[in-house]
Amino acid sequence: MDTSLKNNDGALDADNKNYQDYKDEPDKTSDVLDVTKYNSMVDCCHKNYSTFTSEWYINERKYNDVPEGPKKADVHRCTII
């Protein structure tokens, strides 16, 4: 079970920023996904993209339908610690 986002505003803020970056520059999706790896201290593990915050789906219901967007594949799930 992924509890990394519960009671962790830092991780949620990072995800929201990454999502906004994705919307602004959809051709740089891989760069956006890499951003959280460069926080000063992070705890990373592989998670399916579908486990990311529900806010992403609320803000952009067709996010997963974007052809250039990330597929439901393993990416880094990083939490600021």
UniProtKB/Swiss-Prot annotation:
It comes from the Viruses. Induction: Expressed in the early phase of the viral replicative cycle. Its main location: host cell. Keywords: Early protein, Host cytoplasm, Host-virus interaction. One of its GO terms (cellular component) is host cell cytoplasm. Belongs to the asfivirus L83L family. This is Protein L83L. It comes from African swine fever virus (isolate Tick/South Africa/Pretoriuskop Pr4/1996). The lineage of its organism: Viruses, Varidnaviria, Bamfordvirae, Nucleocytoviricota, Pokkesviricetes.
